[in-house]
Design a protein with these regions (language model features):
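Membrane-embedded translocation segments of transport machinery
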Residues: 2, 10, 18-51, 235-460, ...
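Membrane-interface "cap" regions at the ends of multi-pass membrane proteins
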Residues: 2-72, 101-106, 129, 175-210, ...
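Extracellular/lumenal N-termini and interhelical loops of multi-pass eukaryotic membrane proteins
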Residues: 146-204, 262-276, 343-395, 487, ...
């Protein structure tokens, strides 16, 4: 067990002993000193679970970092911001922002071997709110993120039938094609009307979609079984959830490159438009994507690193995992656009066969075949991001493949693996701190069950026919500004409040090497500046533009953007402030406690002096 002694010179000495049974390195003994002028409370490091081996830790961290955003947001940003040219600001941002922040979080978690709240209380009592804010963000994201996994479960289940249920439009009046489906397209119609039963406004709450309630319950049961026994049991499942996405992506790529139009899709995606690099917005979006893609600010990386042996090379891990995350984004983009290139070719050929040649009588009056079908570039330029890419565009492409149910099962199995890997990390960010700090005095299994149940109950909000609009709100505001706010204070807290040189000493103790100039410059100056600029830009963007969300328009068979009603703006403010306010709240609480403690101490000193003076006998007059 760790032993903690307070030395006379004002240093806290931590004597730590590890064994092969409790960790994946050999037994070690070491000392780690912290100056107590910034740590007013003794660092309480208790015996904790550790990863069974290094592979499980790497797979868990990759599984958390690689998520839905790699598959459905990065390709959209590449298409929007100059194709292959977008990779230049993306990788520059990764070097200046993503990797330094990733290393910082792994280092402080591994050094102090506590969850987010415990780590930041140890670094400085006034910074305890940083860890609390991370826990609140993870809890809010957990409430809606599992709904996306539930959607994947639903699509996986309906994939076990032929033909696929979204392969045709239902019949309308007099055996004609349903007009709404004809306008929307078969996959978009199925998504909004059958899967979601979407209303036309967030104000129209609608009824519960019971099939969504059931798959949401299933998603939480699976996650509970995944997480309840801690990292050692979850590590075994990570061998599947972290590797399956790469296997499925490779299979899709191998099939896609043999299809007509796949090369056109890849060329369209990566053809560089270097003129776009002159736009500051492109650089901001690249930095923002890096920031959210690597998963910093959640506290999850701190929690996962806390299960590591103290001398694990977390610098090498940070570089490897960050580059793996970026490689996954690029590879997923190649796969997505090779499949979408095949889809675009098919749609273009269908349009030509329907309206070209002898069928030109089908054209509306005064409309030419060029105006109706455009060209291949037009079909390739269709923009999808978020759920629309996976549940609408990609499913449409799957329908054009032979044995489409098999490809659908593979695709949604991959999405489930991506989602479960990320949810394990997000939920671990909550449970780690609640358990370590004993905020809820329950065993880990009971605490996990209680957390899952609370999130399930709140998640029923997203099972209503207006649920997708609520999910848009939560997704847009719970993990954007708050994470930027948290990471800014992480960088300032470590580099300027705790002290950069002291942090370098801690890393030198762990890694047997001192951080170089690159790390010092990025941690102290470059990364905080980038985060601050992104935060200011995000706030201005939020304040200067109307806050909108996308709703289903059944009359037009398409989505449109509408402004949130005023009462929703209040909820948005609560979602943002719920985590952000934790940082100043804890700061002022600690400041108040410090003032009260100082006054009490001064009062006791004065009282002791008065009592001593009263007890002292009067001096005798010798004259």
């Amino acid at each position: 067990m760790p032993r903690q002694d307070r030395k006379a010179d004002g240093l806290i000495t931590l004597n730590l002993t590890a064994s092969p049974e409790n960790g994946y390195d050999e037994a070690e003994e070491g000392k780690l000193d912290f100056e107590t002028d910034t740590i007013s409370e003794e660092v309480d490091i208790v015996k904790r679970q550790t990863w069974s081996n290094k592979a499980e830790y790497i797979l868990a961290t990759i599984g958390f970092a690689v998520g839905f955003g790699n598959l459905w947001r990065f390709p959209y940003l590449c298409q929007k911001n100059g194709g292959g040219a977008f990779l230049i600001p993306y990788f520059i941002s990764l070097i200046l922002l993503g990797i330094p922040l990733f290393f910082l979080e792994l280092a402080i978690g591994q050094s102090l071997r506590q969850g987010p709240i415990g780590v930041w209380k140890a670094i400085h009592p006034y910074l305890g709110g940083v860890g609390l804010a991370s826990v609140v963000v993870c809890l809010l994201i957990s409430m809606y993120y599992n709904m996306i996994i539930a959607w994947c479960f639903y699509y996986l289940f309906v994939s076990f039938q032929a033909p696929l249920p979204y392969s045709t439009c239902p019949s309308g009046v007099n055996c004609t094609v349903n007009e709404e489906c004809k306008l929307a397209g078969r996959t978009q119609y199925f998504w909004y009307t059958k899967a979601l039963g979407a209303t036309t406004s967030i104000e129209d709450m609608g009824d519960f979609q019971w099939h969504l309630c059931l798959v949401l319950l299933l998603a939480w049961i699976v996650l509970f079984l995944f997480v309840s026994r801690g990292v050692q049991s979850a590590g075994k499942a990570l061998y599947v959830t972290a590797t399956l996405p790469y296997i499925v992506l490779a299979i899709f790529f191998g099939r896609a490159v043999t299809l007509k139009g796949s090369l056109d899709g890849i060329i369209h995606m990566f053809k560089p438009q270097f003129s776009r690099l002159l736009s500051p917005l492109v650089w901001l979006e690249a930095a923002t994507q890096v920031f959210f893609s690597v998963g910093v600010g959640f506290g999850t990386l701190i929690a996962m690193a806390s299960y590591n042996p103290r001398h694990n090379n977390c610098r090498r891990d940070a570089i490897f995992i960050s580059l793996t995350d970026s490689f996954t984004s690029v590879f997923a983009t190649v796969v997505v656009f090779s499949v979408l290139g095949f889809k675009a070719h098919g749609s273009y050929d269908e349009c030509l066969s329907l309206y070209g040649g002898a069928n030109n009588t089908n054209l509306p009056h005064g409309v030419t075949i060029q105006q109706k079908c455009h060209n291949l570039t037009y079909w390739l330029s269709e923009s999808f991001q978020g759920p629309g890419l996976t549940f609408i565009a990609f499913t449409e492409a799957i329908l054009k493949l032979p044995l489409s149910p098999l490809w659908s099962v593979l695709f949604f199995s991959m999405l489930l693996s991506l989602g479960l890997g990320s949810m394990f990390g997000i939920l671990e960010g909550v449970l780690n701190s609640l358990h370590d700090q004993k905020l809820i005095p329950l065993r880990k299994e009971l605490l996990t069950g209680l957390t899952c149940f609370v999130c399930l109950v709140v998640g029923l909000l997203f099972c209503q026919t207006s649920g997708e609009y609520w999910l848009q709100m939560f997704d847009s505001f719970t993990g954007t500004l708050p994470l930027l706010f948290i990471c800014f204070f992480e960088l300032v807290g470590v580099s300027w409040i705790y002290g950069a040189n002291r942090f370098y000493d801690d890393i030198e103790y762990m890694l047997r090497m001192r951080p170089g100039l690159y790390w010092k410059i990025t941690w102290r100056f470059v990364s905080p500046l980038i985060v601050f600029v992104i935060f200011v830009w995000s706030v201005l963007n939020l304040g200067l533009k109307p806050i909108t969300y996308s709703v289903w328009n059944s009359k037009e068979g398409d989505v449109k953007s509408v402004e949130y009603p005023n009462w929703c703006l209040f909820i948005i403010a609560v979602l943002i402030c719920a985590s952000c306010l934790c940082i100043p709240a804890v700061f002022f609480l600690r400041l108040y406690q410090s003032v009260i403690s100082r006054r009490r101490r001064d009062t006791e000193i004065v009282r002791d002096l008065l009592e001593t003076s009263a007890k002292k006998p009067p001096e005798k007059n010798t004259e």
